[in-house]
A protein has these predicted regions:
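Glycine-rich, basic loop-to-helix element that forms the pyrophosphate-binding segment
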Residues: 67-84
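Donor-binding/catalytic cores of nucleotide-activated saccharide
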Residues: 94-211, 216-235
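Conserved donor-binding/catalytic core segment of Leloir-type glycosyltransferases
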Residues: 340-344, 515-535, 541-544
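Glycosyltransferase donor-sugar binding loop
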Residues: 373-379, 527, 555-570, 588
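A short, active-site helix/loop in glycosyltransferases that binds the activated sugar's phosphate group
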Residues: 470-495, 501-505
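Nucleotide-activated donor-binding/catalytic signature segment of Leloir-type glycosyltransferases, i.e.
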Residues: 569-589
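Aromatic "clamp/platform" in nucleotide-sugar-dependent glycosyltransferases that forms part
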Residues: 610
Length: 773
């Protein structure tokens, strides 16, 4: 007497001759023998059918259905489901296997719980027979039990990668037949052909349960899994994954009427669609030569709107953003008329970057542009927002939501160009720049420090910026040497612009009075934040110690707020510790007229910064007739042709003290330095910032603002690269709270090797540096 099967195993195959025998053997080893195996040969051209027939001759539980034309595994499964004789169905791919107790355990769970779906674990095995733990963990069931609409919501959560593998579940057969009736009968899906079935089955199922046992053995890189993309035609094949999700959309209308939250179904569909787009673009970095990126992206954009591509990458495959930045089509500044400008930063503060942004807003409004200021975070100080500018604080939670909000702002405010001040301070800016580019809006990015700052900080920001600056229409730096640095890294669309004058500088412009040399006590002043990492206020104390040793009668007033390493009280305590209280006064912040009085009372502005981008404090002091004594930063624009500055090499406090003493004692020399200071400050204020910003937006800056690199530029960059690498290492090694970096020699050699690749003409010099090390 024929015993009806409890479970039908659907085995769609196409040219699986090498593996199908193993698959069938795993079926025949089942501990519960009440099953049937429905093999569907999808027009194989090898010996797949012959292998199946040999097993069929041995065991009547094996059935074979032949399809005359290849219709993909989607049609193979359809044929198998329609022919299945059991109440429940399992799926097995021709290059995989079942665990021996797969039928027994999955069927028992379904019967005991009356579930429509039973999930179970998967063993993922690589070609060497080793377990692929990460993927195996991602395939493990998350939920123990789900009912009603929660079945779908749990299996296809919004914002997560859509998982459509049918072989992870046991299904009620009637559920699958209902699903196939919702889709076109002639549908062919070469890629991800299980997703529409899984998606709709989850939407129709009313009860789901799971077991943790790994009942399926998935062999990674067998068959069609995990292979590289060799050409554009192969990428076009993988692009078919998007068809697999988009074919679902017409079927959703019949499901929304029965759901408590129909919008959730649509959100999950859109999320699954983004997931499949991400699946496709993931090949750009994992399985493809970069030479193919451009052509493959062009093909992708014929199928998928560019904003969806960016959102998919941001949500699921952020590692692809660099490929989108370098291989996508860059929008040039000035390609379209500009009427509406968006200025953006993290949050508006009283700091220098916000000051630049607010000055830009003022100049652009004055020139007739519409200006929108967008803060990415809350708690902005709005006092300085000029009248006529619209301020928006972003509210989205999570990067994908904020990128979507960014797109909405660009559309609603009809933005023509974006100026982003966050390039050096955030690693999320490429997501926003790429979304804007996808909408046809170019982004201009500002780098507010010297290009070698990441070398000093000992981080990978240089590589990150090099990989992503292609997303910008223009990269704006603060000096000609910065332009050379980034152009030598392949970022051709680089310019420099001066920073706009600060309110203090504008107030002082034209009012400077030549100062006389000191006739008694030498008054020195410094102002800024007490940032030991960058501005080195402790070096001021070293200079003060040297001046005391030289028996100079002086007083140094240190003005500014505390920072990470020093509060005002901390620095004052250090002054006491060094016995400098008679000479150094740490007074905290001073603003407005109080700061101006302090500057006017000084004979010299002393600055010991180790790195700066522009340093407007130089011009602010010189505008009041106060000369400058400083550690050298020769690339700074305010330093160029400035005869009101005394500069010594970095870290040489003794030399700086001697220069200060000598300048104070030479009345005629001091007078000439004061006169030169006023002249230099006047030059800084002569830039027509309004015209420069308009030329920037129009892509029409004069060539002088984007000079080509010279060999001398490269030599300077090399010298400063070694200096910052060595100094950054030494400072890092001196701080026990930091993890120990690599040896200094190794670090500098890596910098040298990188520099050789960037500056081939300097190879002999760099080789000498390496030999010396």
């Amino acid at each position: 007497m024929h015993t009806p099967p409890l479970v039908s195993i659907i085995l769609p195959v196409h040219n699986d001759e090498a593996w199908v025998g193993n698959a069938l053997e795993s079926c025949l080893r089942q501990t519960n023998g009440q099953f049937e195996v429905v093999c569907v040969d999808d027009a194989s051209t090898d010996g797949t059918s012959q292998v199946i027939e040999s097993y069929q001759a041995r065991d009547q539980r094996i059935r074979l259905i032949r399809l005359e034309q290849n219709g993909s595994a989607f049609q193979g499964r359809r044929a198998g489901i329609m022919a299945a004789q059991s109440e429940y169905v399992l799926f097995l791919d021709g290059d995989d296997e079942f665990a021996p107790d797969a039928v027994e355990k999955s069927y028992a769970k379904a019967r005991a719980t009356k579930a429509d779906l039973v999930g179970f674990g998967v063993a993922v095995i690589n070609p060497d027979g080793q377990t692929v733990g990460g993927y195996q963990k991602r395939l493990a069931p998350i939920h123990h039990s789900l009912s009603g609409d929660d079945v779908f919501n749990g299996l296809f959560p919004v914002g997560r990668a859509a998982q459509g593998q049918l072989w992870r579940y046991l299904f009620r057969a009637s559920l699958l037949r209902e699903v196939y009736e919702m889709l076109p009968e002639d549908l062919v899906l070469p890629r991800v052909n299980d997703l529409p079935i899984m998606f709709l089955a989850a939407a129709r199922a009313r009860k789901y349960v799971s077991i943790t046992d790994r009942l399926y053995r998935y062999f990674f890189r067998r068959g069609g899994s995990g292979h590289a993309v060799a050409d554009v035609a192969q990428f076009a094949f993988y692009l078919g994954a998007i068809d697999a999700v988009e074919c679902i959309r017409p079927a959703l209308d019949s499901l929304t009427e029965t759901r408590k939250d129909p919008a959730q179904l649509i959100r999950s569909y859109e999320s699954a669609r983004l997931s499949m787009i991400a699946n496709v673009i993931g090949f750009l970095t994992k399985n493809m030569s970069s030479d193919l990126h451009g052509a493959c992206l062009d093909l992708l954009h014929t199928r998928v709107p560019q904003p969806d591509v960016v959102l998919a990458a941001v949500t699921h495959t952020p590692e692809v953003l660099s490929a989108l930045a370098t291989s996508g089509t860059r929008i040039e500044a000035g390609e379209r008329p500009v009427k509406s400008v968006l200025l953006t930063t993290k949050t508006l503060t009283t700091g220098g970057v916000s000051g630049v942004l607010l000055s830009q807003a003022h100049f652009l409004l004055e020139a007739g542009y519409r200006v929108t200021i967008v803060a990415h975070r809350k708690d902005s100080a709005l006092d300085g927002v000029p009248e006529g500018a619209k301020f928006i604080e972003m509210r989205g939670k999570g990067l994908p939501a904020r990128v979507q909000e960014w797109a909405r702002i660009c559309r609603e405010e009809e933005i023509d160009v974006i100026i982003d001040q966050q390039i050096l301070y955030s690693r999320q800016w490429p997501s926003f720049a790429l979304m804007a580019r996808a909408l046809g809006v170019p982004t201009i990015g500002w780098i507010h420090s010297f290009g070698l700052r990441p070398i000093y900080d000992q981080n990978d920001l240089t590589s990150f910026l090099t990989d992503h600056l292609g997303a910008l229409a223009t990269t704006v730096t603060l000096s000609p040497l910065d332009v050379a640095y980034w152009k030598l890294h392949g970022i051709e669309h680089t310019v420099y612009l001066p920073n706009p004058p600060s309110p203090l500088l504008m107030e002082s412009a034209g009012t400077g009075v030549t100062k006389s040399a000191p006739e008694g006590r030498l008054e020195l002043v410094w102002w800024g934040r007490l940032d030991e990492r960058m501005k080195k206020p402790a070096e001021l104390l070293a200079v003060a110690q040297e001046l005391r040793r030289l028996s100079v009668d002086f007083e140094l007033t240190v003005i500014g707020p505390g920072w990470r390493d020093y509060t005002v009280a901390d620095l004052a305590a250090e002054v006491e510790k060094r016995g400098l209280a008679e000479h150094v006064k740490v007074v905290g912040p001073r603003l407005g007229e109080e700061l101006i009085r302090s500057i006017d009372a000084a004979h010299l502005f002393v600055t010991t910064s180790i790195i700066e981008g522009y340093q407007l404090t130089l011009a602010e002091a010189q505008a009041r007739g106060v000369p400058v004594a400083m550690y050298e930063l020769p690339w700074l624009v305010p330093v160029q042709d400035n005869e009101g500055i005394v500069a010594v090499r970095q870290g040489d406090a003794a030399r700086l003290a001697r220069e200060i003493a000598a300048l104070a004692e030479d009345r005629e020399r001091y007078l000439s330095y004061s006169q030169a200071s006023i002249k230099a400050a006047e030059h800084v204020t002569t830039y027509d910032m309004s015209s420069l910003y308009q030329q920037l937006l129009q892509g029409a800056l004069p060539p002088e603002f984007s000079p080509e690199p010279t060999l001398d530029d490269a030599r300077q960059i090399l010298d400063w690269t070694v200096f910052y690498a060595e100094t950054g290492f030494a400072e890092g090694a001196a701080k026990p709270r930091r993890t120990a970096p690599a040896k200094k020699i190794s670090l500098v050699r890596r910098v040298a090797r990188r520099s050789i690749r960037t500056f081939p003409a300097l190879e002999p010099v760099l080789r000498r540096v390496q030999r010396a090390l």
